[in-house]
């Protein structure tokens, strides 16, 4: 069993642009070695928006050196980027964007969702890239809900979606640069599940909704992060009520992390170079782009 290193909770939300009230459950600023290859996770909502004809969200902004993973639970988003990719991301869908050598993108509530209003709930996860891949070509993967395997958990305890990696012979559709698992789970009240996590991997359990007991020891509630030691295998989760969770595990990238704003590289010199490349147009450009705050 993996040892629990700590439980962190983020009760306070802040706004990203005018469309995303988020709670930052972890960042590389203070947990880098314990969460690698993951860098950051923001949990937005659930938040009710009234109908509007205005665009809500975040206008064009750059990224370099990592990937962003957006998981939508409720609501609908519209994405566009400088590679020409784009589209709608609805409930159950996942957007896996590789910034790598540089990308410019924007994220807004979709016109349909803005027009009707409703509840928005989503997660954005940042995934680091090893130094050898930080200058790879930018890319974009749309992972539709119907293409993500759903596995029934033992004892009718709930379900697990394999977004990345593998679970009991079911492989997720996301293409990753390093070995990792990203599992999206729903547990029924009273269910207990044993999750296989390899020794040597960093692992974190993200509790989005509900209350759970971990390894029979400690309880964690909504909007909280449970960190585990690299040693040991398996994590036991008991749902004290219906719960929504993410299990993140991966082989650590034991390299220097230097981040500033939308860039995550390995040195200050690379950060300075990234700003210069962005300002001189080396990230490409978007048609009909709109200014906005960075996320």
Regions found by a protein language model. Give the residues of each.
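Jelly-roll (double-stranded beta-helix
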Residues: 1-295
């Amino acid at each position: 069993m993996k040892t629990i290193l700590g439980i962190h909770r983020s009760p306070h939300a802040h706004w990203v642009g005018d469309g995303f009230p988020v709670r930052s459950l972890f960042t590389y600023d203070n947990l880098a070695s314990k969460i690698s290859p993951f860098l950051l996770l923001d949990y937005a909502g659930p938040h009710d928006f009234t109908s509007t004809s205005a665009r809500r969200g975040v206008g064009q902004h750059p990224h370099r050196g990592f990937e962003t993973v957006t998981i939508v639970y409720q609501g609908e988003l519209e994405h566009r980027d400088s590679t020409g990719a784009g589209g709608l991301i609805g409930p159950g869908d996942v957007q896996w964007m590789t910034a790598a050598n540089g990308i410019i993108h924007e994220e807004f509530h979709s016109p349909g969702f803005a027009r009707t209003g409703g509840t928005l709930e989503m997660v954005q996860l940042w995934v680091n890239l090893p130094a050898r891949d930080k200058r790879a070509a930018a890319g974009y993967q749309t992972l539709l809900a119907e293409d993500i395997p759903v596995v029934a958990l033992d004892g009718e305890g709930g379900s697990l979606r394999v977004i990345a990696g593998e679970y009991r012979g079911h492989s997720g559709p996301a293409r990753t640069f390093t070995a990792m698992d990203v599992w999206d789970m729903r547990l029924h009240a009273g269910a207990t599940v044993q999750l296989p996590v390899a020794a040597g991997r960093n692992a974190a359990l993200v509790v989005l909704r509900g209350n759970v007991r971990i390894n029979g020891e400690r309880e964690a509630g909504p909007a909280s992060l449970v960190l585990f030691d690299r040693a040991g295998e398996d994590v036991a989760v008991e749902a004290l009520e219906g719960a929504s969770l993410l299990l993140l595990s991966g082989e650590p990238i034991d390299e220097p992390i230097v981040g500033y704003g939308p860039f995550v590289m390995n040195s200050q010199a690379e950060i300075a170079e990234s700003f210069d490349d962005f300002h001189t147009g080396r990230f490409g450009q978007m048609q009909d782009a709109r200014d906005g705050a960075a996320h």
